[in-house]
């Protein structure tokens, strides 16, 4: 197989990450992630770079965003990778609809595209005539899992709020659905639900306002750990130790919080392995393997102090 050569490296919002010295026989994989201010994606990048070094048979070029709402950077990255003629694009989309048209153009250019972590919107794919598999976790099931852990502690009638992720991201919608599933199953009362766009400081401000409006809150369901950290900071500032918090992602920052009880639980979706796994899928297709179809599930695990 003759692989296309990469003309230039792709800029990351926090600097320039160029792949290893390129060889004629190495395929070039463009990795498009979300915010590198988020520990989850920092770990993902580290895992992907380690995987590149371990395999040694592909060149990685990785792009991240400055913030979780910096969708234009992702779109520009895809367009840049198309112009550069990479062999594969592996993407965790920040917006499940907005990225479909540029990814369609990539596929039309003969580039293998792997959608991982955050699924693309099914309606948008149908509208654009795109058939693309998803490699990633059960976000709804994971949120239900951690939500059930909170419900078990609070008991029926427990009063909770939801801190949502980006409205345009399918995994945010799925995690909200999972939280709502847990609320219904556990007989909890939902007092409020609003987005903090995956961001720590925004979650801090949002939850501070929620707590003022609803001082009777007993539990918080945060759609990612970065926002859970913001909630914990708000609770510490308010001097409240009676409110239970759960998150999603199992980033390193929450380990001590789970150990000392500031965070009840989170969901590990093994972010450090996620991009590496998606890259492997892309390389299998490039090597002549079958086209991926449907949903290729990756692992999740409930993480508690026990």
Question: Locations of the language-model features?
Answer:
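Sec/Tat signal peptide C-region and signal peptidase I cleavage site
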Residues: 17-23
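Sec-dependent N-terminal signal peptides
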Residues: 6-15
């Amino acid at each position: 197989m003759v692989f296309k050569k990469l003309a230039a490296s792709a800029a990351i919002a926090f600097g320039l990450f160029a792949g290893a010295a390129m060889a004629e026989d190495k395929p070039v994989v463009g990795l498009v992630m979300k915010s590198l201010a988020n520990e989850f994606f920092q770990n993902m990048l580290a895992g992907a770079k380690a995987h590149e070094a371990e395999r040694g048979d592909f060149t990685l070029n990785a792009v991240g965003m400055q913030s979780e709402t910096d969708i234009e950077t992702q779109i520009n990255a895809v367009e840049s990778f198309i112009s550069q003629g990479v062999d594969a694009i592996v993407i965790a989309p920040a917006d499940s609809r907005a990225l479909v048209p540029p990814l369609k153009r990539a596929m039309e250019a003969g580039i293998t595209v792997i959608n991982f972590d955050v699924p693309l919107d099914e309606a948008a794919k149908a509208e654009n005539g795109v058939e693309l598999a998803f490699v990633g976790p059960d976000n709804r099931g994971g949120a239900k899992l951690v939500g059930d852990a909170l419900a078990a502690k609070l008991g029926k009638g427990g009063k909770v709020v939801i801190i949502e992720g980006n409205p345009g991201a399918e995994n945010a919608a799925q995690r909200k659905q999972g939280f709502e599933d847990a609320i219904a199953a556990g007989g909890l009362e939902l007092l409020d639900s609003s987005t903090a766009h995956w961001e720590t400081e925004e979650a801090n401000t949002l939850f501070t306002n929620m707590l003022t409006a609803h001082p009777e809150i007993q539990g918080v369901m945060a759609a990612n750990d970065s926002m859970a950290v913001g909630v914990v900071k708000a609770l510490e500032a308010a001097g409240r130790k009676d409110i239970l918090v759960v998150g999603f992602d199992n980033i390193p920052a929450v380990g001590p919080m789970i150990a000392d009880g500031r965070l009840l639980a989170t969901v590990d979706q093994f972010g450090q392995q996620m991009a590496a796994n998606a890259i492997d899928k892309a390389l299998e297709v490039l090597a002549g393997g079958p086209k991926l179809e449907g949903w290729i599930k990756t692992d999740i695990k409930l993480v508690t102090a026990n």
